[in-house]
Amino acid sequence: MNGFLNILKPPGMTSAAVVGYVRRMTGEKRVGHAGTLDPEAAGVLPIMIGRAARLFDYLVDKENTQDATGKISATGENYPDFSAMQEAAKHLVGDIEQRPSIFSAIKQDGKPLYERARDGENVEAPVRIVHVESIELHEETPDHGVRMTIRCGRGTYIRSICDDLGKLTGCPAHMRFLLRAQSGVFTLDSAMTMEEAAAYQAQGTLQTHLLPLDYGIQHMPRADAPEWLRKQVCNGVKLPAKKLPGVLALPEGQAVRVYLRDEFWGMAAREGEFLVWKCLLPPEKEENNANHP
């Protein structure tokens, strides 16, 4: 079983627990997730099954964004008006320094920060640079809350943005709820619940609901190998870049998805005058005849 499941993670469950659930359900050992969601958060959690796990590094780059919708709740004598919050949010857009919450899923010495915090340990998350594309504030709620949609890059912590928004407006704030609506090409409207996935598995139809290996990497350039290079492709031999249309025009080191007769064969990168394989993933019908680099 190879491909992606777009799972709707429920709140109160870790991303690792979702992976364990899918692993037990399918009997497939090679299962992972692409983009951690904190336990309290809900929303899109792409699950990689089988050979799809080898594509993790190509799924999301700096130009891809994820939509996150959350609420903040602020307390204090001088509650900021809506326009003040909108103005403050402008300072949190672009490349910003961020210190994730100690209740995040970031691991320190192999243990998630939220576990260390709950165990009473004195922990502090490292500062990192993240990219925030946009922050859109929607309506206020009667209980001093505000709903907002954030488009951001990989590794951004929405809880920290809520904290920072409170600091900028001079009024303590915290995140009340987070729903990730999109991660790369994986969207909320196409996500399935864990119960739905289990039902498909029980019916023997889960395989038909798997997204193909190249589903999450459509943002990467494509290279089509001619049929006469089939032997080199099957053997994982580097390919002459000038024989693949458009490859020589790509920047040095650019990763591309390689196709042969419109079938996805894996990822390679331009190195000088050659296209060098980084991840050979032959179609299942060809797998026994291919040598993996």
Pin down the residues of each PLM region.
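RNA pseudouridine synthases
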Residues: 1-192, 267-268
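Accessory RNA 3′-end/elbow-binding domains used by RNA modification enzymes
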Residues: 1-10, 14-41, 71, 168-293
